């Protein structure tokens, strides 16, 4: 992809046009095909990695032209305490980056207090939590409680989204999450809609 992006730049294409009319449109097609069941997680991950590689080339050019990438929002992301699974969270991270978000990845096995500290430090629009094991689901509730106890949602600006194999929309509501993403593509769309309100 870097060669194709460089070829487009050398041919006179504007970096923001490459991003908006090429890369973002392509990721939109990926999202639709995944949602329709015509594309599967390995292809989505490959597409997201490709987008990420293209952004690595375009970002310094855009910033050099004082056209800083217009981010759609900032998200702090992590797998909750006790859970060491990375693939789902990594896919979600790549899809958010591809969707135009700044992502602060806290990694795996993230304690509730680490989420609180990251929210204080980075002032994100959204906190995203992932869990793959049913045994770590309570850690989501504990993390949301810690964020609320720290007063970080009192102005209703900060949104919390949860997801992962054992998580359901009902569970998300039960533990006080604002949003639920059934998969990586849906998570990005749900967050975009929530932030547009």
List where the protein language model places each region.
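Glycine/charge-rich, flexible interdomain linkers and switch-proximal surface loops
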Residues: 63-80
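Short, hydrophobic beta-strand segments
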Residues: 31, 74-79, 129-130
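Cofactor-cradling patches in redox/metallo enzymes
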Residues: 92-99, 104-177, 190-192
């Amino acid at each position: 992809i870097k060669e194709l992006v460089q070829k487009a730049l050398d041919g006179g294409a504007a970096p923001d046009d490459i991003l908006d009319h090429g890369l973002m449109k392509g990721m939109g097609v990926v999202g639709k095909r995944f949602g329709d069941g015509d594309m599967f997680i390995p292809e989505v991950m490959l597409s997201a990695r490709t987008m990420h590689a293209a952004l690595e080339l375009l970002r310094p050019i855009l910033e050099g032209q004082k056209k800083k990438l217009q981010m759609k929002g900032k998200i702090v992301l992590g797998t909750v305490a006790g859970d060491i699974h990375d693939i789902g969270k990594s896919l979600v991270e790549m899809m958010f980056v591809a969707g135009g978000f700044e992502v602060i990845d806290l990694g795996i096995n993230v304690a509730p207090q680490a989420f609180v500290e990251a929210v204080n430090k980075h002032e994100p629009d959204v906190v995203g939590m992932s869990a793959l094991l049913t045994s770590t689901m309570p850690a989501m509730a504990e993390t949301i409680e810690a964020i609320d106890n720290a007063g970080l949602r009192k102005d209703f600006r900060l949104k919390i989204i949860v997801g992962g194999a054992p998580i359901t929309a009902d569970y998300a509501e039960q533990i006080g999450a604002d949003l639920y993403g059934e998969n990586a593509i849906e998570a990005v769309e749900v967050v975009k809609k929530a932030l547009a309100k």
